[in-house]
Each structure stands twice: as C-alpha cells, then as structure tokens.
C-alpha cells in the first residue's frame, strides 16, 4: 500500500508569524536583538535547537533561550498560524490514501496544531530518541504507523529533499513555503508543485508511477 507523508511548517501550515513572535519574545527576554520575518524564515527547518542557535548572537549560549522559546511557543503556536489556502481541499481530495505528518518542530506543538487542523492524521514531531530530519527515521516510523510500504514525501525545503533521498522515497517539493526553488534544487532531485490545487493530481501521478515500479 502507498501513502503520503507531509512536512508541516511551510508545507501544510503557514507558521512563520507565530515562530517569529516566539523567537523575538525570547530574544527580548534575554536582551538580544530582534529578527525580521525574512531572517526567521531562513532559520527554520532544522528543529527548534537550530532555530535558537541561529537566533542568539554568535557565541552566546542557546540552551536556556531554547527552553524559554519552547515554553512560550507551546502556548502561543496557534495565534496567527493557519493552513495555506487550498490545503484543506487538497487533503480532502487525497483522503483515500493513508497520510502522516512528520516535522522537526517540537512534538508537543506538532500534536497541538495537528489536532486542531488535521485531526485523524498521524503526526510526529521532534522528540528524544528519534533523530530529526533529514534522518529517515521519522519517515520509517510514520510509514509503519500508517501501515504502508511505499510513500511519496511532500515538503518545502532542502531538508525535505534530503529526508526523502535518505528514506529512498520520491519527493514533491512545494513552492509556497519557506525556501525558494533554487535552494530546493541544490539539495537534489525533486518535482515541484506551485499551488495546493495542483497537488492532488501530481501526487496521484507519482503514486501511480510508484505502484507501477517506475
């Protein structure tokens, strides 16, 4: 059976404003400079730890700010976040396929957001004992959980392309997220989707190719 695995931030949900607010709330609490939306956009994608490493001034400890960020974001992750226009309709069109969401966002925030927007879809975020993407571990765990032996992976960043490559699954890269096409292309082979309305047909075609052994 073939399934579909989705990244969360920048793929299904536009989380950037809530992430920026949480970063800047944390920076203010520690007396550090604020960051622009464009800066935070570049920082995200490799987990909360890396986000805070890039956010604090070079050479400063990031562990204490990380704990503060996670605490604040967990309580404020739903203020400005919403699905990208057309995402809910695309998921409905794909409802016959087993689906899962795998994210480098902290697991508590992933489960909170997915319970609100994508109830019934298995979702996993970063948690102790499971390497974050681009390790293939999250993909393999999700595939086992939803009972599929093949899948197509959908994401918006170079991390997602590398994750799919490491898991030996085909990748569909969306262009409405946190990275531009050139950054994604530099990471490796992928197909590109320009709008959520195009996603069901593109995924259907990729699944057909996968099922036919192409």
Where are these predicted regions, by residue range?
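Non-catalytic pre-domain segments flanking phosphatase-related domains
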Residues: 1-6, 201-204, 209-214
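Active-site neighborhood of HAD-like aspartate-dependent phosphohydrolases
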Residues: 1-42
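A metal-dependent, Asp-based hydrolase signature
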Residues: 42-75, 93
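Short, acidic loop-to-helix structural element flanking the phosphoryl-transfer center
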Residues: 75-101, 107-114, 136
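Substrate-recognition "cap/lid" segment bordering the active-site pocket of phosphatases
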Residues: 79, 106-154, 158-167, 181-183
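Glycine-rich phosphate-binding loop signature in dinucleotide/nucleotide-binding domains
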Residues: 95-97, 145-149, 206, 210
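Short acidic-hydrophobic, aromatic-tinged amphipathic segments that line or gate anion-handling sites
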Residues: 191-195
